[in-house]
Design a protein with these regions (language model features):
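Short, well-ordered junction/capping motifs at the entry into regular secondary structure
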Residues: 109-116, 163-192, 218-219, 245
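Short, flexible loop/turn segments at beta-strand junctions in immunoglobulin-like
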Residues: 59, 117, 180, 320-322
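Surface-exposed recognition segments
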Residues: 43-48, 148-149, 174, 191-266, ...
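C-terminal outer-membrane/trafficking sorting elements
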Residues: 271-348
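A glycine-anchored, Pro-Gly-centered beta-turn/N-cap motif
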Residues: 53, 194, 324-327
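Short, compositionally biased
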Residues: 2-88, 120-121, 146-149, 164, ...
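Active-site microenvironments of metalloenzymes and redox enzymes
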Residues: 36-38, 51-157, 201-205
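Non-cytosolic beta-sheet module surface loops
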Residues: 74, 147, 157, 190, ...
Length: 348
C-alpha cells in the first residue's frame, strides 16, 4: 500500500511540474466509440466508427505565458535534436511571444491568449517538453463532440455559435483570451473558433487513410498537417465539428494555436517506481542508469519542483556535478515509451 501511495504522489508530481501544466488544467476524456467525419463534405467523408482509448486534454489552448516559459527553459528557437532538428519553433508576434533583452515573454495584455505563430514542430516540441503530445485528429474531434456524451451539437458545446465560439460575427477579427466562452459538456473551452489548433496527423482523404479504427493516427506521410476548430474570422459554417483544414508544418500564423494531450498513466503499463535503477544513490558527480533499454529522454526535477534537466543521455549515464545537494525526482523514458521514476539523493 505504501508503494502504491508513493506511485500516486510521483505521478501527480511529474504531471504538475513538467512543463507547468497541472492535472487540474487537464480534462479526462474517457475512451469510447464515435462516428468520425461528415458525409456531406468531400474533405470530411466517408464517415466511419472510431474507437479511442482514454486520454487527458488541456482545458484551453496553450497560452502565450506557457509557451514563453517553455522557450526560456528550452533555450532555442529551433528544434534541438531528433528527426526534426533545426526546424523553426515559432515566429515572434505582437499578439504572441516577444523577446525582451534575451528573455521570452508574452506580449503585454496577451498573457492568457492562445500561443500563436507556432509551427507544427514548435507545438510538438512544447508538448513533448510538457510531458505529453499533440492530439490526433480523431482525439480532437471526439473531445470536441463531448466524448462519451456523444453530443449532436453543430459546434463544440452548443448549436448556437455565439455561446461557445469567437468567430466572424463577434470577434472583431482579433484573437481572444482563452476560456471566455462556454465550455463543452466535458469542460473543454474554445474547441470551436478563436484559433485553429494543430493535430499530430498528416492530412489525407479519409478514403485513402488506412489507419486502424482503434486509436488511428492518420497517414504515415504527407505534405501538410491537420488543423481543426476554425478561427476568429471564419463564418459559423466553418466552425462545424467535422470541418478540417491543413497547412505545412513549417508555416505559422496568428490564427493557429494548439493544445496539450497526455496519455493516461497506469501502474500496470506506463510508469514504474524503481528503487535501484540509479547508481550510485546517493550520488556526487555521475549517475549510471541500470537498464538494458536505450534511453529516449531524461527529466530531472529539483527539490523546489523545477525542471532542471530535460534531454537525452549517452551511454546511460549523466552528470549531476552542477546540482546542489538535495532530493531530486528523476523520470526516465525508454524507447518503448515506458516511464520509470526514482528519487535521487545528491549528497557531497
Amino acid at each position: 500500500m505504501k508503494k502504491y501511495h508513493l506511485l500516486i504522489v510521483l505521478i501527480l508530481l511529474v504531471s504538475v511540474v513538467i512543463g507547468q501544466v497541472p492535472l487540474s488544467d487537464m480534462i479526462e476524456v474517457k475512451g469510447g466509440t464515435f462516428s468520425m467525419g461528415n458525409s456531406s463534405f468531400s474533405r470530411e467523408s466517408p464517415t466511419r466508427n472510431v474507437t479511442l482509448s482514454t486520454f487527458y486534454m488541456s482545458k484551453h489552448a496553450v497560452t502565450n505565458v506557457q509557451f514563453a516559459e517553455f522557450l526560456n527553459i528550452y533555450g532555442s528557437q529551433t528544434v534541438k535534436e531528433g528527426e526534426f532538428a533545426g526546424k523553426l519553433l515559432f515566429r515572434e508576434d505582437s499578439w504572441g511571444v516577444e523577446n525582451n533583452n534575451g528573455t521570452w515573454q508574452a506580449a503585454a495584455g496577451f498573457e492568457q491568449f492562445p500561443a500563436i505563430k507556432v509551427t507544427w514542430y514548435g507545438a510538438e516540441a512544447y508538448c513533448k517538453w510538457a510531458g505529453g503530445r499533440l492530439p490526433t485528429e480523431a482525439e480532437w474531434e471526439y473531445a470536441a463532440k463531448g466524448g462519451i456524451n456523444k453530443n449532436t451539437y453543430v459546434y463544440s458545446g452548443s448549436s448556437t455559435a455565439s455561446l461557445v465560439a469567437w468567430f466572424y460575427d463577434n470577434s472583431g477579427h482579433t484573437n481572444k483570451q482563452v476560456g471566455t466562452k462556454t465550455a463543452n459538456s466535458i469542460g473543454l473551452f474554445d474547441m470551436s473558433g478563436n484559433v485553429y489548433e494543430w493535430c499530430s496527423d498528416w492530412f489525407g482523404r479519409y478514403g485513402d487513410n488506412l489507419s486502424p479504427s482503434a486509436d488511428p493516427t492518420g497517414p504515415t506521410s504527407g505534405v501538410s498537417k491537420v488543423i481543426r476548430g476554425g478561427y476568429r474570422s471564419n463564418g459559423a459554417s466553418d466552425l462545424h465539428l467535422t470541418h478540417r483544414e491543413s497547412i505545412s508544418p513549417d508555416e505559422s500564423y496568428n490564427f493557429t494555436g494548439f493544445r496539450l494531450v497526455r496519455n493516461v498513466l497506469t501502474p500496470a503499463n506506463q510508469i514504474d517506481v524503481i528503487e535501484n535503477l540509479l547508481f550510485p544513490n546517493p550520488a556526487k558527480e555521475y549517475v549510471t542508469i541500470h537498464t538494458a533499454d536505450e534511453i529516449k529522454n531524461l527529466k530531472i526535477i529539483n527539490p523546489e519542483g523545477k525542471l532542471v534537466f530535460d534531454n537525452n543521455v549517452i551511454n546511460n549515464f549523466f552528470s549531476v556535478a552542477g546540482f546542489p545537494n538535495g532530493i531530486y525526482l528523476v523520470r526516465i523514458l525508454n524507447n518503448s515509451d515506458k516511464a520509470f521514476v526514482q528519487k535521487l539523493l545528491i549528497d557531497r
